[in-house]
Amino acid sequence: MDGPAIITQVTNPKEDEARSPVAGEKASQRNISLKKQRGRSILSSFFCCFRDYNVEAPPANSPSVLPPLVEENGGLQKGDQRQVIPVPSPPAKYLLPEVTVLDYGKKCVVIDLDETLVHSSFKPISNADFIVPVEIDGTIHQVYVLKRPHVDEFLQRMGQLFECVLFTASLAKYADPVADLLDRWGVFRARLFRESCVFHRGNYVKDLSRLGRELSKVIIVDNSPASYIFHPENAVPVQSWFDDMTDTELLDLIPFFEGLSREDDVYSMLHRLCSR
């Protein structure tokens, strides 16, 4: 197993730029576009969570398939807008335990790890916040982890407002020790890894119907639309983060989630946002 197969990531546009002048020009255009998007109102950034993607859900009689070890979620190809059909039948055994007394009455927020809260690399990062040793085929490799700006404030506030669950398509041997270092406050009530995803058409999908929580009270925060193709109406999408230390997206999200925590269900507020 090679190093990158441990971590599920999107491609850094800067790496595309380094490969070729043509790719670099396209990457630069993407970077400019992303910076413009960050400058918009935080409310407008949520509109994309209701875009329909040209990706089919598994048939109703199709059992959940455990994913093989491949490198990363592929990007979704935008085509004709079609309705995404949710995954039909929930499993007999849910991924999460019963809600604790501490979290009773709170909504459940599923939070992604890579490029949402942190960026990790097998290449040395001079200003890495953590260096995590990971064993691959009998050899110890160092993973350099950079924290997204304001991740500490974001996690602490989210832990006060919601039942928080870490759900990553990366392997536990990498993600678990990173979560130990990142979550100093015990915000995550549970941690779900690649084996808890559904492998569907080359992507690791986080099927929210398998959590054991009422879907109207579940939100997923993720940088990859492929991760929530079964439940796009539950998603609060974020921009992929790599190394921009001026990024404020997590900080900007806090007031939105403070309002969402007071709603009866997640759909009402998200629908109101899209109708503006």
UniProtKB/Swiss-Prot annotation:
Q: Which Pfam families match?
A: NIF
Show where the FCP1 homology domain sits. 102-260
Stored SUPFAM superfamilies = HAD-like
Q: What reaction gets catalysed by this protein? A: O-phospho-L-seryl-[protein] + H2O = L-seryl-[protein] + phosphate; O-phospho-L-threonyl-[protein] + H2O = L-threonyl-[protein] + phosphate
Quote the catalytic residue positions: D112 (4-aspartylphosphate intermediate), D114 (proton donor)
The UniProt entry, under InterPro entries, shows: Dullard_phosphatase, FCP1_dom, HAD-like_sf, HAD_sf, RNA_Pol_CTD_Phosphatase, TIM50
Task: Quote the cofactor binding remark.
Answer: Binds 1 Mg(2+) ion per monomer.
Q: Name one GO cellular component term.
A: nucleus
The UniProt record lists the EC number as 3.1.3.16
Subunit info here reads: Monomer. Interacts with REST.
This protein is called what?
CTD small phosphatase-like protein
